[in-house]
A protein has these predicted regions:
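Short Pro/Gly-enriched beta-strand edge/turn motifs at strand-loop
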Residues: 9, 13, 188-200, 397-404
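Sec-dependent signal peptide recognition
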Residues: 1-7
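Beta-lactamase-like hydrolase cores
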Residues: 7-46, 65, 71-72, 112-120, ...
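Conserved serine DD-peptidase/penicillin-binding transpeptidase domain
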Residues: 64-339, 457-458
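Short active-site loop at a secondary-structure junction
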Residues: 40-60
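Small-residue-rich helix-loop
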Residues: 38-40, 298, 305-459
Length: 459
């Protein structure tokens, strides 16, 4: 009986379980106060972290920028204002803010209109132009899978993000064998072109997919949906969110009685010789501490990748993906985290080439536990059985509400890294990374939950 209990209450439970025994694993559990190793299995081995990767990005952003940092978005103009007429163009200069228009909240545009009118502008002889030059033109991370491009969870990342870089495509299902009809997009995207091959069939699930590339007006709709379903929505990415923002601002100005001579446009190529502009107004995002909650609690890829790309601009302009990769690697190495074998392709964990060890995550989490920004850090992590992506983990068990951690999920993979508040007052720091397991992620989570519950009983 004691032998069986020991197997259940150690990492041997994971290595001997039929679901996880042959998986690619890296595990480390330590006492945060004493540094004692509670359990360990190949903790130096790098494996795909999935969304646990967001800990590297959000931790670096919090430490470098501070919890009170706010993304600025500038309204600027060229030319002069004469007798209420702007003889030039109005620019919206982005700096990677992921919050603009998120969840359809566009009331900030009314404040922008007020600021423009307060500057004495009654008519614009030029256009509203989206300035997306802070980043290079590589909006889609090359490490992401081709089949992810165009999906809502893998949107392009721009210096001007808007509406969560996501649109809802409303389709209408018909008789079996027919093609579902595209009704509209929310928000409306005037020049988008759908190549629609979504078939209606005698199925019970929604199997429609969206694909396409940043800046391209074409979006491919494929797959199948239940027949005679009525209208339903399929989420995809916005091809050019900055341009959509410029169009929406143009419409608000015109709706308010202001004449704007030309249609909205955008610039994406950085030019260090760009003539200076006159600053008219600066819009600030909510504080970084709030942005991190959306990033980690809801595992928002747009938010994480925007932070990742913004950090890269600290090296040079325009910001590049390579700069962002180097910054994360360099920053955590300077902080004493073992990243020499880490592979960092993106900031959100969507790239399958990402590879991080359990040891790296535990070192990072240990550093953050004593940071001056600890409160903001802990508030950004979902809580077991209660919030976000941890809502189903250890619910209605003795560990409900005691785990603050980030999860990561892809096919055959379930990862967790964070903190456990023990009943005796101790805090454990842990990383459990299980990849290539022959089963569904929810079943892998059940095994991990059994392991964690057994581990605390042993200790």
């Amino acid at each position: 009986m004691k032998i069986l209990l020991a197997i259940l209450l150690s990492v041997n439970f994971l290595t001997s379980h039929p679901l996880t025994g042959q998986a690619n694993m890296s595990v480390l559990v330590k006492n945060l106060q004493t540094g004692e190793v509670i359990d360990e299995y190949r903790s130096d081995k790098v494996v795909p972290p999935a969304s646990v990767m967001k800990l590297l990005t959000t931790g670096a952003a919090l430490e470098i920028l501070g919890p009170g940092f706010r993304f600025p978005t500038l309204l600027e103009y060229t030319g002069t204002i004469e007798n209420g007429v702007l003889k030039g163009d109005l620019y919206v200069r982005g700096s990677c803010d992921p919050t603009l228009g998120f969840k359809g909240k566009t009331a900030f545009l009314d404040q922008w209109v007020k600021a423009i009118k307060a500057a004495g502008i009654q008519r614009i002889e030029g256009a509203v132009i989206a300035d997306m030059t802070m980043l290079d033109g590589e909006a889609q991370n090359p490490g992401w899978l081709c089949e992810d491009a165009g999906n809502y969870y893998a949107p392009g990342i721009f210096a001007l993000n808007y509406y969560g870089n996501t649109m809802n495509i409303v389709l209408q299902s018909g008789a079996p064998g027919t093609v579902a009809k595209v009704i509209k997009t929310e928000p409306y995207v005037e020049d988008i072109c759908f190549i629609n091959r979504v078939r209606c069939g005698k199925i019970t699930y929604d199997g429609a997919f969206v694909s396409g590339l940043p800046y391209s007006r074409e979006r491919y709709l494929t797959g199948a949906v239940p027949s005679d379903l009525g209208t339903f929505g399929v989420k995809g990415d916005l091809p050019n969110p900055g341009l959509l923002l410029a169009r929406h601002l143009t419409n608000r100005l015109r709706d308010g009685g202001m004449k704007v001579a030309n249609e909205a446009s955008y610039i994406a190529d950085y030019n260090p010789l760009t003539p200076p502009r006159t600053e008219l107004y600066t819009h600030y995002s909510e504080p970084l501490s709030e942005i991190l909650k959306e990033t980690n609690v809801n595992s928002n890829n747009l938010y994480a990748e925007s932070l990742f790309r913004y950090l890269g601009t600290r090296y040079t302009l325009p910001g590049t993906i390579h700069n962002s990769q180097d910054l994360l690697q360099d920053y955590w190495r300077r902080r004493g985290v073992s990243v020499q074998n880490a592979i960092i392709k993106d900031g959100c964990g969507l790239a399958p080439q990402d590879a991080i060890s359990a040891k790296t995550f535990v070192q990072l989490l240990t550093i953050m536990s004593s940071s001056p920004n600890k409160d903001a850090w802990m508030a950004s992590l979902p809580v077991s059985g209660q919030t976000g992506t941890l809502k189903s983990l250890c619910a209605k068990t003795e560990l409900e509400g005691r785990i603050h951690a980030k999860s990561g999920t892809i096919a055959g993979t379930k990862n967790f890294a964070g903190y456990i508040d023990m009943p005796n007052g101790e805090t454990w720091v842990f990383a459990i990374l299980i990849n290539s397991a022959p089963g569904k992620a929810r079943n892998i989570q059940t095994v991990i939950q059994q392991y964690l519950l057994g581990l605390i009983k042993e200790n």
